[in-house]
Amino acid sequence: MGNLEQAAEKKPLIVLTGPTAVGKTALSIQLARRIGGEIISADSMQVYRHMDIGTAKIRLEEMDGVPHHLIDILEPTEDFNVVRFQALARAAAEDIYSRGKIPIVAGGTGFYIQALLYDIDFTQIDENMQFREEMERLAAEQGAEVLHERLRAVDPESAEAIHANNVKRVIRALEYYEQTGEKISAHNEAERAKISPYHFFYYVLNTDRTVLYERIEKRIDEMMEEGLVEEVRQLQAMGCRHDSVAMQGLGYKEILA
């Protein structure tokens, strides 16, 4: 079967990605209205309720009647990862197709987008609670950087991709190596080589660096004026800690530090 025939059999999907403040949100809405699409957020922080200012979350009135998926679906004390995103995004895409619409994936979390596009198999190994507890205790006693250096020794690619403060992900990568003797980064890379089940169009937005920096600085000023510090305090009161997944977003962890 030729490439054109294969593409014709696949369902269409559009991806809009790019750096912060480049204009993904506005363009995604314009495009959705023009082609009859619905938007799937690929932002790892906008899934959380009560985190509106620091995530620059789109407001209801800004959606302009376009349905948005994977926004405000979890409490900030809940974990969210690529496996969960993949399952939810797949379901959202099928829901959109069922109405004869086209999914538009918008956001800046590249690994999440790849997980959806290439149907990556995140093999779930048996949990080793003893190992996890040992790693958690090590992080608590000696600091997150100790675990991160341990990961760097066995899987430098994963260490490069995972921030040291994201202790849960660091431990999962170490656990995968402990259980299988293989690097989880190698497993994920092999999965990314798969053929996509979608006929997708992938657009990376960009603009002049000076303009982009000016927009980012303006956005930060607006966030502070709108009450970002108070938002973080409220999240702390709800039980969010420095190592909570929801607190790994830019702005939140800096204020907590």
Write out the residue ranges for each language-model feature:
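Phosphate/pyrophosphate-binding catalytic cores of soluble transferases and nucleic-acid-acting enzymes
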Residues: M1-A257
